[in-house]
């Protein structure tokens, strides 16, 4: 291949990689989309009152638009409907690489539009903080669902709810066994019984380690209850969940969950 043709083909390949989104929709995925994404799952713990509006304004007017300019998205922003700590805002930020995770803060610092739009939040005094505490976890997507799956009806802002679940294990070996169980069989049963996944991830850095975290989406609580009942009654699930090495008693030490609702500007 001549040098000019080689350079042209290399640039085209680079452009395709750069424009690739860390998402997939119903259907197949390309070879590049099989590379697992990284997710930052952020929680803003708030006090009722001015902190709620201040944080919402910041995310809507500054953070989400800035992430979009950086090619990061779709970003999910959720309020807690049912959970142990309310009000808490959850933010799900997808990345295609660890380099993206590491570089984002510096890139936002250099974004004048972000700094201006978010000034009221970013420059609060210590005597009047924007939140009680922010927590963050870094997750690696599962092999069987390597990218975010955007729920149907997001563009039309259809009503929807989300269930965020965390499965803790007593050891790394047990944790990896539960990941294997999901990858090899359990996620397929989820899909068949109407439990629609948004993401599954192994928590690399965060609290309650070792754990895996995943998110499901439903039209409403009635659909949630109906589809979980179908899953629990499924013969394949009953067989899988009683298979030696895959029982909860062997590989899961605690399960916690929260129900979330998307903000009007959430991209999920």
Q: How would you describe each model-predicted region?
A:
Residues 2-25:
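N-terminal export signals
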Residues 7-8, 35, 53:
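Anionic, Ser/Thr-rich low-complexity intrinsically disordered regions
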Residues 18-47:
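C-terminal segment of N-terminal export signals and the immediately downstream linker at the start
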Residues 22-33, 64-90, 96, 184-213, ...:
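Short, glycine- and small/hydrophobic-rich beta-strand elements in well-ordered beta-sheets
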Residues 37-41, 88-90, 160-164, 211-213, ...:
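Intrinsic-disorder/low-complexity, polar/charged segments enriched in Ser/Thr/Lys/Arg/Asp/Glu/Gln
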Residues 45, 49, 141-221:
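Surface-exposed interaction/gating patches
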Residues 45-55, 61-69, 74-155, 171-173, ...:
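Hydrophobic, ordered structural segments
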Residues 257, 261-267:
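Short, low-complexity, Pro/Ser/Thr/Gly-rich segments in the mature regions of secreted, periplasmic
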């Amino acid at each position: 291949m001549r040098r000019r043709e080689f350079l042209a083909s290399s640039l085209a390949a680079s452009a395709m990689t750069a424009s690739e989104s860390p998402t997939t929709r119903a259907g197949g995925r390309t070879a590049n989309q099989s590379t697992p994404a990284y997710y930052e799952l952020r929680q803003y713990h708030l006090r009722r009152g001015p902190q709620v509006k201040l944080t919402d304004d910041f995310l809507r007017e500054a953070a989400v638009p800035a992430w979009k300019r950086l090619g990061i998205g779709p970003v999910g922003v959720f309020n807690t409907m049912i959970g142990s700590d309310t009000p808490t805002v959850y933010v799900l930020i997808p990345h295609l690489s660890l380099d993206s995770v590491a570089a984002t803060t510096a890139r936002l610092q250099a974004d004048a539009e972000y700094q201006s739009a978010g000034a009221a939040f970013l420059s609060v005094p210590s005597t009047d903080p924007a939140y009680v505490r922010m927590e963050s976890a870094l997750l690696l997507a599962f092999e069987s669902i390597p990218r975010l799956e955007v729920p149907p009806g997001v563009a039309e802002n259809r009503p929807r709810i989300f269930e965020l679940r965390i499965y803790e294990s007593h050891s790394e070996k047990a944790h990896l066994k539960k990941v294997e169980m999901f990858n090899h069989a359990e996620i397929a049963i989820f899909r068949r019984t109407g439990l629609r996944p948004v993401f599954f991830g192994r928590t690399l850095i965060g609290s309650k380690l070792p754990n895996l975290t995943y998110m499901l989406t439903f039209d409403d609580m009635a659909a949630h209850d109906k589809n979980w009942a179908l899953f629990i009654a499924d013969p394949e699930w009953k067989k899988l969940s009683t298979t030696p090495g895959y029982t909860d008693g062997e590989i899961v030490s605690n399960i916690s969950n929260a129900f979330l609702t998307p903000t009007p500007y959430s991209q999920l």
